[in-house]
Amino acid sequence: MWTLVGRGWGCARALAPRATGAALLVAPGPRSAPTLGAAPESWATDRLYSSAEFKEKLDMSRFPVENIRNFSIVAHVDHGKSTLADRLLELTGTIDKTKNNKQVLDKLQVERERGITVKAQTASLFYNCEGKQYLLNLIDTPGHVDFSYEVSRSLSACQGVLLVVDANEGIQAQTVANFFLAFEAQLSVIPVINKIDLKNADPERVENQIEKVFDIPSDECIKISAKLGTNVESVLQAIIERIPPPKVHRKNPLRALVFDSTFDQYRGVIANVALFDGVVSKGDKIVSAHTQKTYEVNEVGVLNPNEQPTHKLYAGQVGYLIAGMKDVTEAQIGDTLCLHKQPVEPLPGFKSAKPMVFAGMYPLDQSEYNNLKSAIEKLTLNDSSVTVHRDSSLALGAGWRLGFLGLLHMEVFNQRLEQEYNASVILTTPTVPYKAVLSSSKLIKEHREKEITIINPAQFPDKSKVTEYLEPVVLGTIITPDEYTGKIMMLCEARRAVQKNMIFIDQNRVMLKYLFPLNEIVVDFYDSLKSLSSGYASFDYEDAGYQTAELVKMDILLNGNTVEELVTVVHKDKAHSIGKAICERLKDSLPRQLFEIAIQAAIGSKIIARETVKAYRKNVLAKCYGGDITRKMKLLKRQAEGKKKLRKIGNVEVPKDAFIKVLKTQSSK
């Protein structure tokens, strides 16, 4: 039985001499060397990838630095990054060409279901061009604003990017953000106009937009259809011609940058590394510049797109490294690895991911606490940008306060908990991290600093003990067709945004820049923007620090008792409308009692909104058939006194499902 192994595609000149040769045949057997038919002997030495039967180690020394290209694919969400990555993998023979090749690099179930990339993935492509063997290291990056941290991290290991733009939709907000990330990192940018096969595609209009917004000549744009594979070969040519090889030194001591890491329960941490200097091989003793811990390298290799062990990794190459690290915190993102007893100057790392949204997470049933704790620990090993603090609530029990990069990040994390660990949770309304400048010497002594960050609204300090409150702000970019500009400007003003800039990209499209309080966009701004613009507007934001704000802590009271789970921090101007809405939702969710329930929203001692749940009424006059009116009055008076007493001593127990209903509605609103 013989197995036919497909060969990688090269460019036309490289393919020509091979067209008449026989196909490469591989005899079965335990790790036997490939045998050839009539094909030239040199073919065997050109074999650079392995089938499932052959896990022989690759010799990476065959690729000199000048034949290496490290690049990322960046784009707005749904502009075809992952589809282009699939075609590049097929063209270079990394994967077989089949109809099932959709989102090959997107390995998470949530990524495939939502059709988005959440975690950046790496693949090493081997490509023959003009008789030379090239090593192309591809990093497929996410497109959604919440995961821009993944993009900036991936770019640190690259020398160039493919900036993919949809020929139908044109430049969108995330396209602009990704371009400037690449521009600031001084990377070569190759604009690729995708989806030219669509009926409404207008590549010439998109070329003009790219020239106007990014100052890239229109003749540098490559027009392709990643879905059909049209003109994708020219993208590979452009990568070789326009992206420079990495500037590295193989004779210097090892310097490797950890730009990502994942956790495997059997092998420990798998660190994705980019080598800037030196060589690393199995058995080497390496030291982390961050923790100063020493490890022994168990395995090195490249991702092709699955793990492919190699003898060594050389400077300029991107691959993975397993060294017995038991915790992802040991493989700190941005850390520098060097050889033991050969210390080097650490590489400039990254800014650590800063959580923008916080939410409480509790198990549906407290008996599931330990299982959920284990699931969160395992998931955070693969997602170091999530912060975890223990928390507890009278109504919901023990839980955690989690920090996320954005609302989609929170939804994806929750979905992964359900799918991968079968865990059901209650998520409280998301909040943002506020700051308070303290004036109380007692509080300053307690916190050991004058400026504190508040991630839990229940811990918001009183106004009398604070000089000023600060709220996080972001610089938002909105790109929209011009007919929706007026409506969108009104929406932004209603969200307390300040306009910073307005540019016409072409005759029909406008780019607006606004400074937003983060709290105003974190829950439902994106949905409102999409509905106002019939789905055509796109939105992206970047951190812009903090600004002074008139913030107040709003308590929700049930018969005068504070419900801690529903405490919120709001802007003074919006306190009444938000308080009224929460009271109305709580009224609809609470079961009636034998006594009246007063639901109140309060700022300090001032009540700003109220709703009442009427009591069940028992007819105490049913047994009276006529008779003196004073008898009836006496019975009614006794009933009123009993209800008054019951109201004082009767605790209003808020059922868990009522909490879930209020919190979910608040999030969806």
UniProtKB/Swiss-Prot annotation:
Segments forming domain tr-type G: 66-247
Chain positions recorded as GTP binding sites: 75-82, 140-144, 194-197
Major enzyme class: hydrolase
Any one biological process term the GO annotation gives: positive regulation of translation
Keyword annotations: Disease variant, Epilepsy, GTP-binding, Hydrolase, Membrane, Mitochondrion, Mitochondrion inner membrane, Nucleotide-binding, Protein biosynthesis, Transit peptide
Broad class of where this protein is predominantly found: mitochondrion
PROSITE patterns: G_TR_1, G_TR_2
Family matches, as Pfam families: EFG_C, GTP_EFTU, GTP_EFTU_D2, LepA_C
KW Transmembrane helix (keyword) present: no
SUPFAM superfamilies cross-referenced by the UniProt entry: EF-G C-terminal domain-like, P-loop containing nucleoside triphosphate hydrolases, Translation proteins
UniProt disease link: Developmental and epileptic encephalopathy 40: A form of epileptic encephalopathy, a heterogeneous group of severe early-onset epilepsies characterized by refractory seizures, neurodevelopmental impairment, and poor prognosis. Development is normal prior to seizure onset, after which cognitive and motor delays become apparent. DEE40 inheritance is autosomal recessive.
NCBIfam families named in the record: lepA, small_GTP
Function: Promotes mitochondrial protein synthesis. May act as a fidelity factor of the translation reaction, by catalyzing a one-codon backward translocation of tRNAs on improperly translocated ribosomes. Binds to mitochondrial ribosomes in a GTP-dependent manner.
Protein name, entry field: Translation factor GUF1, mitochondrial
Upper lineage: Eukaryota, Metazoa, Chordata, Craniata, Vertebrata
